[in-house]
Each structure stands twice: as C-alpha cells, then as structure tokens.
Amino acid sequence: KPKLVPVPSTNIIPERDVDKRPILECRHLGIDFGGLTAVDDFNMAIGRTEIAGLIGPNGAGKTTVFNLLTKVYQPTRGTVMIDGRDTAGKTTIQVSHMGVARTFQNIRLFGNLTVEDNVKVGLHEHIKYSALSGILRLPSYWKKEREAHEKALELLSIFDMQDMAGYQAGSLPYGAQRRLEIVRALATKPSLLLLDEPAAGMNPSE
C-alpha cells in the first residue's frame, strides 16, 4: 500500500497555507479492477506550498493513485478534491484545466517535435490567438508566437536546456527527456504538480 510522507523543504510562501483549504485532498479513495483491489482507503491532504512524496514498493499502487488523481482512472469509491472542488465525473482534460499537471513513469513526449515545441504544447492554454489570425499570419499571431518562444526558453533555462531548444525531443538522452517532461508540465502553470518517478534514468549530477 502506498504511503504519503512529508519531504523536508523550504516553504517559500507559508502564509498561504495558514487556515487555508488544501490544494489536494483525497478521502477513502479506492479502485477495483474486476475482483482485484488495487488501491483501498487512501487518504491524504496537501497544502498549497507543501512538497510530499508517495513511497512504496513496486506494485504498491503509486502510479494507480496518480491515475486516480488525474482521472486516467475513475475511482470505484472515495473522493478527490482539487482546491476545494470535487473532481467526481471530471475528465483528464477537465482536471488539467483545474490546475493539475503531471509527468509519467514512462516518458510521454512528442519525440518527432523539437524540444521547444514540446514546451509550447504545455503553453497552449495560456498563449492563444484566433484561428483566422493563425491562418492569415496576422501581427497578433506573430506576437503570441514570440511570447511563446520567449516563455519556452525561460522555462528550459530552469534545467539548463535552452541550448537544446531546436533539438528533436526523441534524440535527447533519457535524463534530458525526463527534464523536458517536467518543463512541459511547468508550462501549464499548474497549481498542483505530480511527478511520477521524475529522477528515473538521471545520473547523480542531474
């Protein structure tokens, strides 16, 4: 059974967590696959500025919990609250629009796109232009494209990847692909970021 443990960290904006509702709360969460119970009676609450780790042996259900939180799976029982809002009946896209982003145990990048374009996929919710502007390449289109380019490079620089912006994502070393997946998740400006084994495949320096 997976277990939630606190991770020592610096709370950079602690005042937001005082007498505030948690950004994520699970109550008695569970799911059955046929006659097999994969997760049962899972409870947790995470504050807006907290960092927590979900630990457990292989097969304990950690990734299944992530899939329940992001609605890849619909729970058999229990509730998931995001910033005080019930996610019952929500789709994966709707949960994403509620401010939840995640990475995957198995990398899910667009390998044929450039590193920069992968980041722009995460930016699309926040940098918009009309279909007409895009088709006719109007000034508003180019303005938004410049904004997306600058923001993508800014995010890539967090992981020292700005010089890789023009590389094909699928050609990157495994550890760099892991970092790119995190950058793409950050591009969505999430309120809650879920990282499924983010350090897998990275060397100690990474």
For the regions a language model picked out, list residue spans one by one.
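Glycine-rich phosphate-binding loops of nucleotide-dependent enzymes
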Residues: 1-206
